[in-house]
Amino acid sequence: MRVTSPEIQRGIKVSELLDMFGSTAFNARRLGEAAKICEEMVKSDSFVFLTLAGAMIPAGMRKIVAGMMQNGFISSLVTTGANIVHEIVESLGIGHEIGSCYVDDTALAEESINRIYDVFVGQEAFERVEEFLSGIIEGLDGIYTTYEFLWEVGKRIPDERSFLRIAAEREIPVFCPTLHDSIAGLHMTIYRKNLQIDFFRDVSRIIDFCFQKRKMGVIVVGGGVPKNFTLQAMLLAEGFDYAVQITTDSPQWGGLSGATLEEAKSWCKLKPDAKAVTVYCDATIALPMLYAYLLDRCGES
């Protein structure tokens, strides 16, 4: 099969462009392969995890995550405490501002503005989050998994487009193994009375999912704890059938975010014949394109 140049025409769909990428090279081809694997995941009725590391919510990816839940493209989300906090910031109508990385950060601090590369968020946003969460935390009694606690949070979020609210309404588990490593964790430490979070029950539940009699898939955005928490659950099962990883890290430094999916096969986290591809690309580019592809090719799952 020859490499062919995409024939770009006015009105082309994202799905058509990604199909053309499949006969190009480098990471365009990898992104085209990822689209096909994601399509097969959904159409085969696989149980699909989305793992989300990095500052994806401040970067504007919340509606992509929510849409993937609403359309049945993902079955569970595994993410960081930071992304949860920033989703609450968005859900309360505060939001994040377009900023710049070429600024005087000391001057920003004096104005109570926090910087996430080229995104700004005011300190008052986190004060609003504290006000919102404190009432929930103080009112809960007993032992919860992270996803059960986040369902309670989601039930109280007014924004219908919030992925936390959608997850609560549909009982989609949102695992957050680093919930305590976030501003939300600080608030829980301060305000909890009889509330306890059982992280080990999270592990038991995600392992249960991995033993289902259906195909299993994972879309890995970045790496870190969400990636490891999800892949390690397969150590006791048979391994994932499908896997797509979007990362900007490379493997030779030995870090998990750059570890290839082929390496994961040595741990039996992926089946030997698993369909898998790693796309080296900014996830804020690749993830929306994959979502648009699935909308066109799969509709509502």
From Swiss-Prot:
It is an enzyme of class 2 (transferase). It catalyses: [eIF5A protein]-L-lysine + spermidine = [eIF5A protein]-deoxyhypusine + propane-1,3-diamine. Its EC number is 2.5.1.46. The keyword Lyase does not apply. The active site is at K269. Keywords: Hypusine biosynthesis, NAD, Transferase. It comes from the Archaea. GO terms for molecular function: deoxyhypusine synthase activity. Transmembrane segments: none annotated. Pathway: Protein modification; eIF5A hypusination. Its cofactor is NAD(+). GO terms for cellular component: cytoplasm. The keyword NAD applies. PANTHER family: DEOXYHYPUSINE SYNTHASE, DEOXYHYPUSINE SYNTHASE-LIKE PROTEIN. Belongs to the deoxyhypusine synthase family. Catalyzes the NAD-dependent oxidative cleavage of spermidine and the subsequent transfer of the butylamine moiety of spermidine to the epsilon-amino group of a specific lysine residue of the eIF-5A precursor protein to form the intermediate deoxyhypusine residue. This is Probable deoxyhypusine synthase 1. The gene is dys1.
